[in-house]
A protein has these predicted regions:
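Catalytic core of soluble alpha/beta enzymes
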Residues: 19-173
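Acidic, Ser/Thr-rich peripheral helices and adjacent loops at domain boundaries
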Residues: 181-188
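Glycine-rich, aromatic-flanked loop segments that form ligand/cofactor-binding clefts
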Residues: 1
Length: 188
């Protein structure tokens, strides 16, 4: 079994990475540079998502971090490989202001803020273009949001998207349910 990040990349052939950020810009830049150095050295072509995990109080704070990521020479490949930013703003503030300043850098998705059936509708109006799918949020909500992604993308010419989360509620059957849902909505 691999015991380090480098060994995991070698053992599993990893090319997609979900990287957490803390909301403390200096610490995040330092950590991202260290993570990027490993990935850049080991993986010829890769994709990254940044997970803010509700650690930021505002879109401006996230935009500041993203600007620094873009400006940091050691993060050039890493920045170009970012697919989207996941739920950077605390759910209590996520729907207070538009996030268009963030979306200008990379698409932004809601995750923890997806508290009710119309959360994605609200988020769309503020500039979010993505939403996560988790079995714990409900099978039908994932189907509805998948339909919204298809319809809104066709109507607006914007690439709305969904991501499949790795959250399961219990071992065994729940894993198969999550995988079946991800496959059904095209997240494979």
């Amino acid at each position: 079994m691999p015991e380090s990040f480098e060994e995991a990349i070698d053992a599993y052939g990893l090319t997609f990475f979900k990287v957490k950020v803390s909301g403390v810009a200096d610490a995040d830049i330092d950590r991202l540079c260290r993570v990027a150095a490993v990935i850049d050295a080991k993986v010829p072509s890769y994709s990254v998502t940044l997970d803010g995990n509700e650690q930021f109080s505002s879109a401006e704070a996230v935009a500041d971090l993203l600007a620094r990521v873009k400006e940091e020479p050691r993060l050039a490949r890493f920045a170009a490989s970012i697919l989207f930013v996941e739920q950077p703003i605390a759910r209590a503030h996520a729907f207070e202001k538009p996030v268009k300043v963030l979306a200008a850098f990379k698409p932004v998705e809601i995750d923890e803020s997806d508290a009710d059936i119309d959360a994605f509708v609200t988020a769309r109006g503020l500039g979010y273009s993505g939403i996560s799918s988790k079995s714990c949020k409900g099978f039908y909500r994932s189907l509805l949001n998948r339909a919204r992604v298809a319809q809104w993308s066709a109507e607006d010419g914007i690439a709305y998207f969904m991501s499949a989360e790795d959250l399961t509620t219990q071992g065994g059957l729940a894993v198969q349910q999550d995988l079946a849902l991800a496959s059904l909505i095209g997240m494979t």
